[in-house]
Amino acid sequence: MPSALAIFTCRPNSHPFQERHVYLDEPIKIGRSVARCRPAQNNATFDCKVLSRNHALVWFDHKTGKFYLQDTKSSNGTFINSQRLSRGSEESPPCEILSGDIIQFGVDVTENTRKVTHGCIVSTIKLFLPDGMEARLRSDVIHAPLPSPVDKVAANTPSMYSQELFQLSQYLQEALHREQMLEQKLATLQRLLAITQEASDTSWQALIDEDRLLSRLEVMGNQLQACSKNQTEDSLRKELIALQEDKHNYETTAKESLRRVLQEKIEVVRKLSEVERSLSNTEDECTHLKEMNERTQEELRELANKYNGAVNEIKDLSDKLKVAEGKQEEIQQKGQAEKKELQHKIDEMEEKEQELQAKIEALQADNDFTNERLTALQVRLEHLQEKTLKECSSLEHLLSKSGGDCTFIHQFIECQKKLIVEGHLTKAVEETKLSKENQTRAKESDFSDTLSPSKEKSSDDTTDAQMDEQDLNEPLAKVSLLKDDLQGAQSEIEAKQEIQHLRKELIEAQELARTSKQKCFELQALLEEERKAYRNQVEESTKQIQVLQAQLQRLHIDTENLREEKDSEITSTRDELLSARDEILLLHQAAAKVASERDTDIASLQEELKKVRAELERWRKAASEYEKEITSLQNSFQLRCQQCEDQQREEATRLQGELEKLRKEWNALETECHSLKRENVLLSSELQRQEKELHNSQKQSLELTSDLSILQMSRKELENQVGSLKEQHLRDSADLKTLLSKAENQAKDVQKEYEKTQTVLSELKLKFEMTEQEKQSITDELKQCKNNLKLLREKGNNKPWPWMPMLAALVAVTAIVLYVPGLARASP
């Protein structure tokens, strides 16, 4: 059965190694070379000091068809695409690897003693399936900086913001780990200081023992000198006094040296206590920093959850916005359709109104003219009746005088009367027809043409007098004329009925216009209510975003305070370390001074011993026994001195070794401090970058909220553009800015169109109001004209017919008053 293949290729920044072809029949161990397992081209063992023996495992899962890598508690870690799989000395979960990934085993380590840097293993891995096909590349998968572990779900992968927060927490945890290592090293330093203190105590004890031996030798020498000399009492007294003075001087010098040593010891103890206090303070501060770090991590997690919740809320609000905009567009479309229908109806009603108004004016003019003609006919009939009565009376009188049969005459008179009446009626009908034709001509002509019917009427009146005489002679023609007059009266009644019908239609049109107005107002009220609700929703969302921004600002302030506190604590610990180093140097100097003083004392003692030996050689002949004792004492003293010197040399060498160890550890601490400083600088820069990104995201969210408030009256095209803007916001902020500018321009265009439509609506409303005002003015003028007509009728009934030209002139003036505004309105 063929097996999967993994090829490890060396990269330029890696520790050099040959290309490895490893077949993954079973899980393959990756580690450092040992005696039993040497590096070869078919295994994953590398000759690198940075790797652990059991560093990691790599294998191929035949069920899922995927390659996995696991860190097995390595000290320096395993990295996939610069992402560490687990913490130090912890086993990681299996993580999927893809072909083309960059895998790093360990990190670069620098030795302090030799200043040698040991490189790590950095390789590009190529994976081949058992069928010989290359595994999928990282570029073919969803862009994610971290490989997904086996026990994680792809849906729960964090966003870029939460991943950066996780990286920050990882950096903080590594810094805490380094601080713990520093604490351990400080504890070892404290132990070394205690050991040096004990060694100094033992050295002081040895010095005191040496002083005691020297004092005893001095006493023995004095005794030998006193015994060997056979001197007088005065000389003995003088020697004793001199010896006592020397003894006193030696004692004073020894006491002063002891006092100095004790003072230095007290100072050293005091400094050690101060160092211990500073260590305890630093430990307390470290614990406090750990607690603060845990709190900040919890707050960062809460912030990430809140941020995700805010993003979801923004999505929900955007969905609601889309739904509301869709409803608003539907309402706008309905409103526009109704508006168009109402506008069309209004235009039709205005046209009908104009037509009806023209009909009313024409009928009113016809009615006025017919009324005038009827009044003139009535006057003529009265005159004719008076004439006929006079003639009848004259005929009756003549007949009564003649005494003949009057019945035939009466019948003839009645026939004559009927014929006259019928003739007048036919004349009236013909005159009404002529008046209608003249009215149509008068509407097209000027005021001079409107005055022409009055002249014609005056000429007709003169002709009517002549026709009256002819009517008496032609009764049959007059009867037909009277019939025509009756028909004209009936047509006048029909015209009145038509006027009433037109008035009813006008009232109905006004009612329709009022109902359309009410509908428009209702639609406007609904639109305003929806706008208010939408504005309230937008205000609530802006308030929530402002609250989240305030919380983010508070967290920024807290992180800045923590960073400042951490920097101050680091500086204080650095100052304390510097002071401890200075104190150690002072202690070294004091030890050197003590050693030099001790050497001077030993030299002085050796000189005194030489003097004593010379004196002993002088007195050797006198006291051989004392010489033997002195030689034995000298031998023992030399042995002890040699032993003391050997012990001191051993202690000096041991102290020098410890000093070298301390210096090495001090150098290591300094390098670690420098690395910590660098890491702190990196962390501060990353925090600043994170803060800048958070600030940019806040600005972008503010811009999005402002854009959402601007895009309230946008349409479906703007919704698609807003969706594209949101997707591009997740990908690239620069593209988002450009798209936002486009969306703003489009929103401004839409807003301008909306303003234009509003202006058009306002103009239409103004026109509608103007038409209503004109209607009201026309109705008022009609009422005034009716009142004037009634007054004129009353005056015509009361006054004789010769005033008819004046009435015609008044009617012409009213017609001009009615028609001139209509012409002025029609001209624009």
Curated annotation (Swiss-Prot):
Subcellular location: Cell membrane, Sarcolemma; Cytoplasm, Myofibril, Sarcomere, M line; Cytoplasm, Myofibril, Sarcomere, Z line; Cytoplasm, Cytoskeleton, Microtubule organizing center, Centrosome
Disordered: region residues: 433-467
Keywords: Cell membrane, Coiled coil, Cytoplasm, Cytoskeleton, Endoplasmic reticulum, Membrane, Mitochondrion, Phosphoprotein, Transmembrane, Transmembrane helix
SUPFAM superfamilies: SMAD/FHA domain
GO MF annotations, alphabetized: protein-macromolecule adaptor activity
The keyword Iron appears for this protein: no
Cytoplasmic topological intervals: 1-802
Keyword presence, Membrane: yes
SMART domains the record matches: FHA (SM00240)
Source species, domain of life: Eukaryota
Gene Ontology process terms (BP): muscle contraction; negative regulation of hippo signaling; protein localization to plasma membrane; regulation of membrane depolarization during cardiac muscle cell action potential; regulation of sodium ion transmembrane transport
Ranges of biased composition (kind: Basic and acidic residues): 433-446
Boundaries of every FHA domain copy: 28-85
Protein known as: Sarcolemmal membrane-associated protein
Gene: SLMAP
